[in-house]
Amino acid sequence: MTGCSAPAETSGSRKMVDPFGRNISYLRVSVTDRCDLRCFYCMSEDMTFLPKADLLTLEELDRLCSAFIAKGVRKLRLTGGEPLVRRNVMSLIRSLSRHLQSGALKELTLTTNGSQLVRFANELKDCGVKRINVSLDTLDPARFREITRWGDIQKVMAGIDAAQAAGLAVKINAVALKNLNEDEIPSLMEWAHSRDMALTLIEVMPMGDIGASRADQYLPLSMLRARLEGQYTLTDLDDSTGGPARYVRVSETGGKLGFITPMTHNFCESCNRVRITCTGTLHTCLGHEDASDLRRPLRASPTDELLYETIDRAIGLKPKGHDFIIDRHNRPSVSRHMSVTGG
């Protein structure tokens, strides 16, 4: 009696596990490096953006995302720049939603500055997006303009209103900035919680030349948390979100507050994510200069086998942890900008 042998494992069916046993199930994809704001901790005011010809087409982005989903990605986040300023980006989101319908993908989401949500919130909901992150560092209109260099906070507020009206869950991300918005964190938190939105605080990360010293902007969240504990009752939560944030429940508001602390307490031991830039470069670590070109194998063959092999090699080189430091001599730890990598 002859037994049936198991089918041979192919690169496409092989799940992504790095050298340290971490299963890669979360993909962040920057669909553009362009943004309609110029937040000073992210990019310089006269930022030179990539030539549009260098960007992957929307069809190529779809194929790349689909390849990663075939290899075990269950959460896909679109980022930028500002993802919603990419021309025809909704056609990509609508196409990717087929993976939600098939059950291959558990979550399709995005991080946005909120400026385009009035236009796109309902369509995002129709495409199966259930939750989004909105980057907002202040509630003060003048301070918002200072941080973003020319932004209109009313557009963002209207966008948040539109997102919630469409049925999207919204989480607010705020970068903690020394001597700029640190005094406003309690009121920002109370506002977010009053709107049934979690707030996640993020330390400044040393990525890309921004024409200013990040040492002047850096505020350790351990210090900020200690201040908050003087005003509020914070209870640690054992939320396993697969992300870098550590959450607490704020008794006085009933809401959730997250801390992302790459500088003071890294999150590398549980890292389950990789990033793809809008030019098709794969970065397996936010805080390393590692890079694997996926555009070449993507365009070299109409089938995905070469692409899968390139992905497997890159995952096999994923480092154990990042190299972030705040350099008093104003040198970024990583030369590429967050807007290119995907924030």
From Swiss-Prot:
Signal peptide annotation: none
Keywords: 4Fe-4S, GTP-binding, Iron, Iron-sulfur, Lyase, Metal-binding, Molybdenum cofactor biosynthesis, Nucleotide-binding, S-adenosyl-L-methionine
Similarity comment: family membership: Belongs to the radical SAM superfamily. MoaA family.
A Pfam family assignment: Fer4_12
Stated name of the protein: GTP 3',8-cyclase
Domain of life: Bacteria
UniProt cross-references to CDD domains, sorted A to Z: Radical_SAM, Twitch_MoaA
Annotated pathway: Cofactor biosynthesis; molybdopterin biosynthesis
Cofactors demanded by this protein: [4Fe-4S] cluster
Organism: Nitrobacter winogradskyi (strain ATCC 25391 / DSM 10237 / CIP 104748 / NCIMB 11846 / Nb-255)
Cystine bridges: none
Record's keyword annotation contains S-adenosyl-L-methionine: yes
Domain Radical SAM core as annotated: residue spans: 19-244
